[in-house]
Amino acid sequence: MINYRHIVFCLCVMVVVDSRLTPYLAAIEQVDPIVKIVLPIVGRFDPEEFVTSWQGNNPCEWFGTNCLEGIIIGISFISLNLIGTISPHFADLTSLRVIDLSHNRLKCTIPFEITKLKNLTIVDVSYNQLHGEVPRVRGIVILTERNPNIESTCLLVPSPTRNKNKPTVLVLLLGILVGLVVAGGASFGFYLYRIRKQPKRLQEPNEAVTLTQQQSSDESLVSDESYVISLQLQYRVLRRFSWVSKGPLLLTRQLKTNQNPHLPYM
C-alpha cells in the first residue's frame, strides 16, 4: 500500500529547499561576466585583501579597477603587500591599457600571455621579487625596477615559447658565421691569385724589348744586304760604260729608298 504521507512530506521538503536556493541560484546566473574573469586574477594574490572590499556585482565599483563606459581599462594594485604570482588571466581582459602591480611582494615571472593584449601600453611591476625573462613587445612599456633577480631563470613557470625560439636564433647566427667564413676565404683566394699573376705581367715588358731588339737587328741585316747589292750593281754598270771615261771608276754609296730604283743591267 502506497504511503501517501511519505510522498507528501518529501514534496514539502523539496518545495522548502527550492525556495531557499532560488536566490542563490539566481545570483550565480546574474553574475557579471567580467567578475568571472577578474576573480581568477585575484585568486593568484592574497584574497583576504579583496574579500571585505569587493562586494556587489559591478567590478567598476571595486577598488583597484579603472573603467571607461563600464569597461575595465586599468588594474591598479599598488602597495597592497600582495604575495603570489601574476595571473595569465590578465589576458582575458582584452580592453586593458594599464596594469600596475608595483610595490608588492610578487614572485616568479611576468606571464607572456599579457603580450596578446592589443590595447595594453604600460605594465608596472617594479619593486617586487620577480624572476625570469621580461617579455619584449613593441608598443608595451614594462617597468621592472628593483626586481633584483629579473631576467634570471625561474623554475616554477617556464616559458615554452621562448625556448622554441632559441634554436631558430642559433641557426640564424650559425648561418651568418658560415657566410662570413666563406666570404673571407673567397677574398683571400682572390688575393693570392692576384699576387701570382703579377710576376708574369712584370716579365711581359722584357719580352717586348727582346722582340723589338730582334726586329731591329733583322732590319739592319736586310739594309746591309741591300747596300751590298746596290754597290755590286753600280760597279757592274760603271764597268760596262768604262770605255766612255778613261778615269778611275768611282763608286757612290746610295741609300736604299723607294725614290732610288735599281739601274737596269746592261
Curated annotation (Swiss-Prot):
Keyword field contains Repeat: yes
Keyword Transmembrane: yes
Topology versus the membrane: Single-pass type I membrane protein
InterPro entries: Auxin_Ser/Thr_Kinase, Leu-rich_rpt, LRR_dom_sf
Pfam assignment, any one: LRR_8
Residues making up the signal peptide according to the UniProt record: 1-19
Stretches that traverse the bilayer: 170-190
Extracellular side: 20-169
Subcellular location: Cell membrane
The entry's keywords: Cell membrane, Glycoprotein, Leucine-rich repeat, Membrane, Receptor, Repeat, Signal, Transmembrane, Transmembrane helix
Entry protein name: Receptor-like protein 5
